[in-house]
Amino acid sequence: MESKEERALNNLIVENVNQENDEKDEKEQVANKGEPLALPLNVSEYCVPRGNRRRFRVRQPILQYRWDIMHRLGEPQARMREENMERIGEEVRQLMEKLREKQLSHSLRAVSTDPPHHDHHDEFCLMP
C-alpha cells in the first residue's frame, strides 16, 4: 500500500498535467478563434466563405475518387493501346497483301503460257 505522501504527490502531478493541458487547449482556442473548425461536408453541402463569393470557386468533391483516378490514368494508356492496335493491324494488313501477291505470282506463273524464266537449272544437269 502506498503511503499518504506518495498518493498526495501523485495527485499533485496529475493536477499539474491537467492544468498544462487546459492551458494548451485555451491557447489553441484563442489562436483558432477567427477560423471556423473544419467539419466534414455532406455530398450536397459546399462551403463558400462570406463576402466576395465570385473570388472563391467551389470545387466539388470527387464522389468516386478511385473511379476518377483510374479513368484519368487509364485514358493515356487506353489511347496508346488503341494506337498500338491500329499500328499492328496495319502491319498485319501489309503482310497479308505481300503474302497474297507472292501466292498470286506463283499461281499465275503455273497457269501462264509464257515460257518459264531461265533458271539455270539445266546448266547443272548431269545428263549425257
Swiss-Prot record:
Protein's cellular compartments: Cytoplasm; Nucleus
Any Gene Ontology biological process: regulation of apoptotic process
Residue numbers binding Zn(2+): 125
Tissue occurrence: Expressed in central nervous system, with high level in pituitary, cerebellum and temporal lobe. Widely expressed in breast cancer cell lines.
SUBUNIT field: Interacts with LMO2, possibly leading to regulate the transcriptional activity of a DNA-binding complex containing LMO2. Interacts with OMP.
Superkingdom of source: Eukaryota
InterPro entries: BEX, TF_A-like/BEX
Family classification: Belongs to the BEX family.
PANTHER family recorded: PROTEIN BEX1-RELATED, PROTEIN BEX2
Modified-residue entries (Omega-N-methylarginine), positions: 50
Keywords of the record: Apoptosis, Cell cycle, Cytoplasm, Metal-binding, Methylation, Nucleus, Zinc
Any matching Pfam family: BEX
Stated role: Regulator of mitochondrial apoptosis and G1 cell cycle in breast cancer. Protects the breast cancer cells against mitochondrial apoptosis and this effect is mediated through the modulation of BCL2 protein family, which involves the positive regulation of anti-apoptotic member BCL2 and the negative regulation of pro-apoptotic members BAD, BAK1 and PUMA. Required for the normal cell cycle progression during G1 in breast cancer cells through the regulation of CCND1 and CDKN1A. Regulates the level of PP2A regulatory subunit B and PP2A phosphatase activity.
Annotated segments matching region Disordered: 107-128
Keyword presence, Disulfide bond: no
Protein name: Protein BEX2
Annotated segments matching region His cluster: 117-121
Domain notes: The histidine cluster (His cluster) and Cys-125 mediate zinc-binding.
UniProt GO molecular function: metal ion binding; molecular function inhibitor activity; signaling receptor binding
Bias type Basic and acidic residues, positions: 115-128
A GO cellular-component term linked to this record: nucleus
Entry coiled-coil feature ranges: none
